[in-house]
Amino acid sequence: MANVIKLRKGLDINLKGKAAKQKFSVKAAAQYALVPDDFVGMTPKVVVREGDKVKAGDALFVNKKQTDVKFASPVSGVVQAVVRGDRRKVLRVVVEADKDQQYVDFGQKQVASLDGDAVVKALLEAGLFGYINQLPYAVSTTPDQKPRAVFVSALRDMPLAGDFEYELQGNEEDLQTGLTALSKVAPVYLGIGAKQTSKALTEAKDVEVNVFDGPCPAGNVGVQVNNIAPVNKGEVVWTVDPTAVIFFGRLFRTGKVDLRRLVAVAGSEITKPEYAEVLVGQPIADLLEGRLAAKNHVRIINGNPLTGRKATMDDFVGGHTSEITVIPEGDNVDEMLGWILPRTNDFSVSRSYFSWLFGKNKEYALDARVKGGERHMIMSGEYDKVLPMDIYAEYLIKAIIAGDIDRMEQLGIYEVAPEDFAVAEFVDSSKLELQHIVRQGLDMLRKENA
């Protein structure tokens, strides 16, 4: 029977524009792109040139520091461009897709007969290993980092997040195959939500199922690691998105790299929020065509409103993206008296507005404004109310800002990822970019321990 872990700390932010459980069709794109920045902590080395012919599954770039970690093309076609930015940083590799797709055949495998080394080798050869992240440091892992355990969270509870159970329909076999494969490497802990009922999750085999009952960010894999088996110095755990587990399962079942995924197109500026089945690297413009309520004064987000990246119509669906969100930018708003005016349509954690009288089910159309500038940390205890982890979050942030590595280690930086602080950043009256601060601290520590 599954373990039930109840979490009281957190905050559910109910936004307008949640995707209905319906699919809309998206045409096959002429171009697809793989973006190295989607794989945090990895320095890319491009292994193709413009004009090269590739199949789906061929490597476009590798990890420069560990070249056996490849990153596979989502489609077959001709490499159209290797786009670089400042200091020749690789921004993306663009492939012009064939009309008839061709795949590298990696061979079907029976995962029950494989050992851990064989599983890792298969993922490396197919260019899928880079979809595995690790704690500490919250970066794309490498095969020399032997994990103590593998954590998979099937609970998506960030604002406007897509329903993984809906995405799972038709992919149950691949999910189980992927979980079984990962269990050959290390014990697997599967985190699900209290309201999730799919048997593919509740009765998953070869894993330990843990049910998390609580508000956002209960679905964050870092929160789940902290509440099940915290990471100590010198230990490594893998964290894997459940969609990536499906990718792994498809590889072992079919012998092909198939990066199809269901993406929620959501937000108050979307006329008809629904799901689209697309490939990793699909142009965002294809998903938003004819669905924007307004073409100007909107914020397009590659991901969810709290942890996603600001995007444009020229960007592409990310390697870990499960939703594309569009909300008002807020740059054309003229409010009389600003925050002083009593109102019922603005969200407030501290009940400064009367909107709390309408209950927790009221939906809000929040915009992208921060509504204030960065200021000193005066209010104590704000982070602790919404961060269900056994750490002193405020003191950890101060230690990172001060660059005190010893103090950072003592306060549990090995256990956290930037997205764990997303809700804390939302409620922070000091308007600090907590996720950016945590990322800087993790990078500093990783460099120090290299």
Language model features with spans:
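Mobile cofactor-carrier "swinging-arm" domains
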Residues: 1-15, 22-23, 80, 85, ...
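N-terminal, Lys/Arg-enriched amphipathic/low-complexity engagement segments
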Residues: 1-47, 62, 212
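Short, solvent-exposed loop/turn positions at domain surfaces
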Residues: 42, 48, 65-68, 272
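Short, well-structured beta-strand-loop connectors
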Residues: 48-62, 81
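Short coil-to-beta-strand transition motifs
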Residues: 68-76
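Buried, small/hydrophobic-residue-enriched core segments of structured protein domains
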Residues: 69, 83-286, 290-450
